[in-house]
């Protein structure tokens, strides 16, 4: 007899199970998309940007944060629910859950953050977000491929020749290394966190142009499976999603927490105007019930209920479970995001 490592066995199990992400991407690529094929990712990679704040604050306390142990448990519970298609994590978290076999018999795909640019460094007392984003990568792709075959790469454009050339060279180097290690990735493109000299009305289209331009020189094998971008309103979303449908697949990021209505209205509008993926971090993490939130996100996307009704159902659930809501119903029904307000009038 010979000995087979646990890592080999887990990898073998993963290969036997069709991940929901792959099924849905195939539907989108072949123009067979239905709202049930909308992809949702839970982004729990926050410690790569916010450090010890990542697990979120303890309920009822202003300065105390949950433990990393609680953060891992939240990941396990979301994977077990099978409501998401992707769990995005730090490499360290992914390694722990991989060795537990968390994804071995699950339709949920494990993904890791493969770079940690300075614009996500939200450390207490820091001022990193006062400067243009600089490329930086902690993760070793050679190590990553042992635990996950999908990752996120992030880039932010600054309208500055030297800084953008540096960022694009980093992307090019990354693409070459991804190919060498037989990994796949999706591309995150943030809105710049500082004034870059682009008119606010033109900024969404500047970002669209940057995305298309930076990928035009890449062969299909080197391009991302999908994008993760900020929802900048219906016009920009329609333009980007209609540019190369089925090949340039657009996803949205969640940005800040906002109200519960913001969360449901965001997935509703984004899907309506062409997005096929939602990758939410704080909009899931900082809720009273993350699993119920994702369940209702799916119902909204599938047009079973509207965003207003979803908030009302959510508050009824909290009341029945005797969970104290962070906002009362009237406040939580408010749409606070300006892009979403504009989308209502579009």
Features from the language model and the residues they span:
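Alpha/beta catalytic barrel-like cores
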Residues: 17-159, 307, 315-323, 342-346
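C-terminal helical cap(s) of enzyme catalytic domains, especially alpha/beta-barrels
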Residues: 271, 286-325
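Active-site-proximal loop/turn and secondary-structure-junction residues that shape catalytic pockets
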Residues: 44-46, 90-95, 114-118, 157-159, ...
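Alpha/beta enzyme core
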Residues: 66-82, 101-105, 129-150, 159-184, ...
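Hydrophobic residues within beta-strands of alpha/beta enzymes
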Residues: 87, 153, 227, 278-279
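Glycine-rich phosphate-binding active-site loops on the catalytic face of alpha/beta enzymes
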Residues: 255-257, 273-290
